[in-house]
């Protein structure tokens, strides 16, 4: 065994966020710079150059592994899956649009 080596099991694949509501949206970067969004960023509050239904994304984040991100190149369109925030569903910071309960 090498330090840091991963030994995957023969069991079923790990499922991210089971039993939580998800939403699939098409996102377009209408800006002239790349935009990267992290796994736990409140998606409705992302950079204004990203074009999508922000009301539908309220209270949701990317349904990707913790600590990872998705990058949107200028002019790029991509489909992403969002997932509801869990826990007490309280959001502070980001662009300051919520500052409390979702």
Swiss-Prot record:
Enzyme class: hydrolase
InterPro entries in alphabetical order: Urease_beta-like (IPR002019), Urease_betasu_sf (IPR036461), Urease_subunit (IPR050069)
GO cellular component assignments: urease complex
Catalytic activity as recorded in UniProt: urea + 2 H2O + H(+) = hydrogencarbonate + 2 NH4(+)
Pathway, per record: Nitrogen metabolism; urea degradation; CO(2) and NH(3) from urea (urease route): step 1/1
Listed GO MF terms: urease activity
Keywords: Cytoplasm, Hydrolase
Record EC number: 3.5.1.5
Biological processes per GO annotation: urea catabolic process
Location relative to the cell: Cytoplasm
Gene3D superfamilies, A to Z: Urease, beta subunit
Lineage: superkingdom: Bacteria
Keyword Hydrolase carried by entry: yes
Protein family according to the UniProt entry: Belongs to the urease beta subunit family.
Subunit structure and binding partners: Heterotrimer of UreA (gamma), UreB (beta) and UreC (alpha) subunits. Three heterotrimers associate to form the active enzyme.
Matches recorded under PANTHER family: UREASE (PTHR33569:SF1)
The protein, known as: Urease subunit beta
């Amino acid at each position: 065994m090498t330090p840091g080596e991963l030994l995957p099991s023969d069991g079923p694949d790990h499922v991210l966020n089971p039993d939580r509501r998800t939403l699939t949206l098409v996102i377009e970067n209408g800006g002239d710079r790349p935009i990267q969004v992290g796994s736990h960023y409140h998606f409705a509050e992302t950079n204004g150059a990203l074009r999508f239904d922000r009301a539908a994304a309220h209270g949701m984040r990317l349904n990707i592994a913790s600590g990872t991100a998705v990058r949107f190149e200028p002019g790029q369109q991509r489909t992403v899956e969002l997932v509801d925030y869990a826990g007490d569903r309280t959001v502070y910071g980001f662009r300051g649009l919520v500052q409390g309960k979702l």
